[in-house]
C-alpha cells in the first residue's frame, strides 16, 4: 500500500482518539483532527493523557519528546505504548520482553537495562527509539508508523563534511557488516539507515527496524537495504520486523488504536 494512502487511512482512524479535546491542534497554520492542542498546555501532560493508551504508565515517557509527539500518529509514542508494559518500574526488561526477543533469535537477560530515545554518545546525534543493553548484547530499535520512509539527508556542504569526517571511516568496520562502503550519494539517500547500521560492530549487536508491512514505502526501503547492502554474515543482526506480526494480541488496546 502506498505510504500516503496508508497514512491517510490511519489518520482517519486515529482522529476519534482526540474527540474529547475541545480544539484541534494546528500544523502549518491549519487545524487537524489527529493533532492534540498543546498551545497554552503542558505538552508532556497532554501526551500522557491523550496519546499514551489507557493502562500504560507515563512514568518512563522520554523527557525529549519529539516535536510531533502530540500527533496521534507519532511513532515515538507508538513505541512507548508497545514497550512500556514490558518493563519494570525502573525500566528493566521483564520476562515478556525477554520472550519477545527470543522469538526473533535474540537472547537478552531478565532485568536488562532499557531506554527510550537512546543516544550512545558517539557524537553524531543519532537517537534510537528504544534500546536494550544486556551485557555484551545490544539491541537498537528504529520505529516507523506512517512515515514516508527512512530519513534522507540534504545534499549540502554540511552533510558532505559529516560524511567525510564522521561516517566515511566507520561505514565499514572490521567485521564488515556492509557489503561495500557506500559513496556519498548512496549515503545521503539512505542516511538514517546507514547511521543506524554502523552500530553493528560485532555479532552481539542487533538493529531492529520495526514498521507496518502495510506501509509500502518503508517496507520496500528496509527490505532493499538489507538485501543489497548487508553482508550475508550479518543478515540476522539487521532485522526488518512488522507490527502486524509482532503484536500477538490483535484485540489489545494498542492494536485497536494503531492498526484497527
Model-assigned labels for residue ranges:
Residues 97-101, 143-146, 153-159:
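"Short basic amphipathic alpha-helical interaction patches in structured regions
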Residues 73, 77, 81, 123-126, ...:
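Short, well-structured alpha-helical interface segments that form or flank functional binding sites
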Residues 131-140:
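Active-site beta-strand-loop-beta-strand hairpin of nuclease catalytic cores
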Residues 194-197, 201, 206-260:
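Non-catalytic C-terminal interaction segments of nucleic acid-processing enzymes
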Residues 1-115:
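Nuclease-adjacent, charged terminal/linker segments that flank catalytic cores
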Residues 68-69, 113-131, 197:
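Catalytic micro-motifs at enzyme active sites that drive phosphoryl/nucleotidyl and oxygen chemistry
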Residues 150-209:
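Acidic, metal/cofactor-coordinating or nucleic-acid-engaging core segments within structured domains
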Amino acid at each position: 500500500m502506498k505510504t500516503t494512502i496508508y497514512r491517510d487511512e490511519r489518520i482517519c482512524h486515529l482522529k476519534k482518539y482526540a474527540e474529547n479535546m475541545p480544539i484541534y491542534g494546528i500544523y502549518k497554520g491549519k487545524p487537524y483532527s489527529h493533532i492534540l492542542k498543546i498551545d497554552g498546555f503542558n505538552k508532556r501532560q497532554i501526551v500522557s493523557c491523550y496519546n499514551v493508551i489507557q493502562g500504560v504508565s507515563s512514568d518512563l515517557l522520554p523527557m525529549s519528546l519529539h516535536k510531533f509527539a502530540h500527533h496521534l500518529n507519532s511513532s515515538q509514542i507508538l513505541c512507548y505504548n508497545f514497550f512500556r508494559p514490558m518493563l519494570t518500574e525502573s525500566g528493566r526488561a521483564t520476562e515478556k520482553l525477554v520472550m519477545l526477543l527470543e522469538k526473533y533469535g535474540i537472547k537478552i537477560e531478565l532485568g536488562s537495562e532499557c531506554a527510550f530515545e537512546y543516544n550512545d554518545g558517539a557524537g553524531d546525534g543519532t537517537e534510537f527509539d528504544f534500546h536494550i543493553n544486556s551485557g555484551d548484547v545490544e539491541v537498537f530499535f528504529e520505529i516507523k508508523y506512517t512515515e514516508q520512509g527512512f530519513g534522507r539527508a540534504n545534499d549540502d556542504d554540511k552533510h558532505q563534511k559529516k560524511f567525510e569526517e564522521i561516517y566515511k571511516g566507520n561505514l565499514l568496520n572490521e567485521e564488515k557488516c556492509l557489503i561495500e562502503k557506500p559513496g556519498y550519494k548512496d549515503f545521503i539517500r539512505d542516511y538514517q539507515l546507514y547511521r543506524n547500521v554502523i552500530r553493528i560492530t560485532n555479532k552481539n549487536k542487533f538493529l531492529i527496524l520495526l514498521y507496518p508491512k502495510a506501509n509500502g514505502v518503508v517496507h520496500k526501503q528496509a527490505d532493499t537495504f538489507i538485501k543489497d547492502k548487508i553482508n550475508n554474515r550479518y543478515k540476522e543482526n539487521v532485522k526488518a520486523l512488522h507490527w502486524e506480526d509482532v503484536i500477538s494480541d490483535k484485540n489489545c488496546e494498542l492494536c485497536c488504536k494503531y492498526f484497527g
